[in-house]
Amino acid sequence: MNKKLRVGIIGTGNIGTDLLIKIQRSQYLECSIFTGRNLASPGMRIAASMGIRLSDEGIDTIVNEPNLCDIVFDATSAKSHLSHAPILDRLGKFVIDMTPAKIGTLCVPAVNLDEAVKSRNVNMITCGGQASIPIAYAITKVHPEIEYIETVSTISSRSAGPATRINIDEYIETTEKGLRIFSGAKEAKAMLNLNPAKPAIDMQTTVMAEIESPNLKQITIEVEKIAQQIQRYVPGYRIVVLPTYDNHRLLVTVRVQGLGDYLPKFAGNLDIINCAAIEVAEHFAKKNLMRNK
């Protein structure tokens, strides 16, 4: 059996619990501590049934026992991560930030995975960022002159937990920052709609760019290419509207369905960021395990 890198998860809500279940399938990762604030939470009960070590002392558990883990997923909130980040940095941990705190290197695995894992703190941006930024990146590979990009993500209200709702402002800021960085556009706008429809809808994200005379054929090639790369770690990622041009605007729409691990399949918004985070952790683990052979 291959040696695995030990993972600590701070935050035992939807994101943290789904990460825990995904880690159980990994050839390169094992969860050594699942820590939050409430031992009676649903996530804690699931972790206990798996025999995972639990704690209700949050980050203090890792501070008191630094050798517990090599990688830390912070699945708390942007505000909490602002205080967690310097502590974990002093402990020398490789940190994957699931919040929109935007302290570390912004990462979309299909775009900058190798570069991101050179950092000690990797920020997974937002669910809308993971869905839209690769499309924006593909479009501006063909048309780097684009100056304005906009993205609108619509998710089921049932998939928006307390952390998502608390972090809405940070979500907008971080998604817009990621769009500007990866596309090169001077201006970016991000919007998030919560849809209460029943049955619940899958996540859907539309990317719009202002452009004159687009090369639709080449844009379509680049968009389909990057979608295939994303599907390697997010199987439910699909282009539902190929590049379309109307009234000086280029549009592409994607839909994301989750794997249905801890979260329902319609919660593709949570699944895409978790799948991306696992991809980062496994890439880091493979590099370190090879180095230590």
Describe the residue ranges of each PLM region.
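N-terminal Rossmann-like NAD(P) cofactor-binding subdomain of oxidoreductases
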Residues: N2-I146, T151-V152
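Active-site-lining helix/loop region of Rossmann-like oxidoreductase modules
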Residues: R6, I10, N14, Q130-L250, ...
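C-terminal helix-rich "cap/oligomerization" subdomain common to oxidoreductases
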Residues: H283-K293
